[in-house]
Amino acid sequence: MSESNELIEQRIQKIEELKKQGINPYPVRFFPDSKSKDIAEKFEKNPTGPETKFKLGGRLHSKRVMGKASFAHLKDNSGIIQLYATKDDLGETQYSIFKSLDLGDIIGLEGYLFKTQKGEITLHVTSVELLAKCIRPLPVVKEKDGVVYDAFADVEQRYRMRYVDLIVNDHVRDTFITRSKIVSEIRSFLTQEGFLEVETPMMQPIAGGAAARPFVTHHNTLDMQLFLRIAPELYLKRLIVGGMDRVFELNRNFRNEGISTKHNPEFTMMEAYMAFGDMSTMLDLTERLITHLAQKICGTLKIQYGKDLIDLSPPWKRTTYVDIIKEYSGIDFSQIISLEEAKKKASELKVDVSKCQTIWKVADEVFSEKAEPNLIQPIFITDYPKELSPLAKSNPDKPGYVERFEPYVAGREIGNAFTELNDPFDQKERFEDQVKQREAGDDEAFMMDEDYIRALEYGMPPTGGLGIGIDRLVMLLTNSHSIRDTILFPLMRPE
């Protein structure tokens, strides 16, 4: 039997021993009235005596048994506090239970605070109760100096067993607490800007709103094929048609694509649409939102991301899609007239464009390989080609291009926005072109959506639209370098 299995068996045996004593190892309830950090801070300012009792609940973090007295540490979601327990105070039965506790056990305590000779605020335990046994041993390095867990450093294992990761790595928990604050702050910001939060279908008969492969499912009762949404865009714009002038949705999207440090098949997006807005109003909104978040969450507009100090102070730099590709690859795609020439130039840069069917698809691969990794400081890339933007309004001053921008920070895209196409005739033509690309083998090309065309035929006002990837934004504001570090339960291969 392995050492781990032996420890598990020993802990299970302790549960059985408690049952024999008539003690329920999984009691129905325990209600703490305090948090360790709060009572320690208050005690430091205003010491209390034995008459003031506190009830705490948490995990046993460390333990040192010294005969009739023991020291330990309890960890709750506010911090760690030292415990002092004696046989005289607890009595034979409870002190025996205290001594038999294992690291990771969830316990309930009652006691009063005092300071040790070394000046450490400590809970003098007067009552102890096992609330849930930690049957599987937590990763342990040592049981002294307040350091009892290893780093749980195997990344794959951390993602698979996030519950253990959260127990042993405080910085992981801090990341997800920050994520929650970011999401809450986004909602508050947009609400103050006059946007109404809405919910649109997660299952859609047509996968639209983005160039991506969808997940496919089937509704048995209706006997119809459905897709998990790749984007909420077309439904949100239907709401603009219906007179809801400012709407946003912050929710999940699903794309049946690869997994990387920047991509997870299930991810969170915020999309916002503003009637009587355009690309410029959404650019302003994006800049204000992200700088607001940085100031609120990080306390500064200059944030450290890896080795780079990123300055989010407005105004952000702006440059065109064609110019940024030319800057980092030397290729001016506005001057290329054949697919063969485009592929040849890309291949000279060792960019794989074998699956690309158009010049601008080649350009996009070159952009991703050569330009994007260099966009460390915040920048808005503008004036995208019409072919790559089937839902964006054409730029009247630049034929072949649209009113679209994407913000980039730390070498990755964090959003996408444009002046929305509201001409139903133009939109139908673009859908038809996308269908041709799809029939030619591009499984990321858009599907035809006749109902969306019908909605546009009722009239949609000039509109600005914006989408921001929440997971990537959290990466930026928490100095995380994999999207999996910002998603509690990322998709994993089977063990």
From Swiss-Prot:
State the free-text cofactor note.
Binds 3 Mg(2+) ions per subunit.
InterPro entries to which the protein is assigned, alphabetical: Aa-tRNA-synt_II (IPR004364), aa-tRNA-synth_II (IPR006195), aa-tRNA-synth_II/BPL/LPL (IPR045864), Lys-tRNA-ligase_II (IPR002313), Lys-tRNA-ligase_II_bac/euk (IPR034762), Lys-tRNA-ligase_II_N (IPR044136), Lys-tRNA-synth_II_C (IPR018149), NA-bd_OB-fold (IPR012340)
SUPFAM superfamilies cross-referenced by the UniProt entry: Class II aaRS and biotin synthetases, Nucleic acid-binding proteins
- Any one Gene Ontology biological process term? lysyl-tRNA aminoacylation
- A GO-annotated cellular component: cytoplasm
Chemical reaction(s) catalysed: tRNA(Lys) + L-lysine + ATP = L-lysyl-tRNA(Lys) + AMP + diphosphate
Question: What is its subcellular localisation?
Answer: Cytoplasm
Q: Name the NCBIfam families for this protein.
A: lysS_bact (TIGR00499), PRK00484.1 (NF001756)
Q: What class of enzyme is it?
A: ligase
- Which cofactor names does the annotation list? Mg(2+)
UniProt-listed Enzyme Commission number(s): 6.1.1.6
**UniProt: Mg(2+) 2 binding residues:** E413
Task: Please describe the quaternary structure of this protein.
Answer: Homodimer.
Provide this UniProt record's keywords sorted from A to Z. Answer: Aminoacyl-tRNA synthetase, ATP-binding, Cytoplasm, Ligase, Magnesium, Metal-binding, Nucleotide-binding, Protein biosynthesis
Looking up CDD domains in the UniProt record yields: LysRS_core, LysRS_N
Originating species = Leptospira interrogans serogroup Icterohaemorrhagiae serovar Lai (strain 56601)
Q: Which family does it belong to?
A: Belongs to the class-II aminoacyl-tRNA synthetase family.
UniProt name for this protein: Lysine--tRNA ligase
- Which Pfam families does the record cross-reference, listed alphabetically? tRNA-synt_2, tRNA_anti-codon
Q: Detail which positions bind Mg(2+) 1.
A: E406, E413
Gene Ontology MF terms in the entry: ATP binding; lysine-tRNA ligase activity; magnesium ion binding; tRNA binding
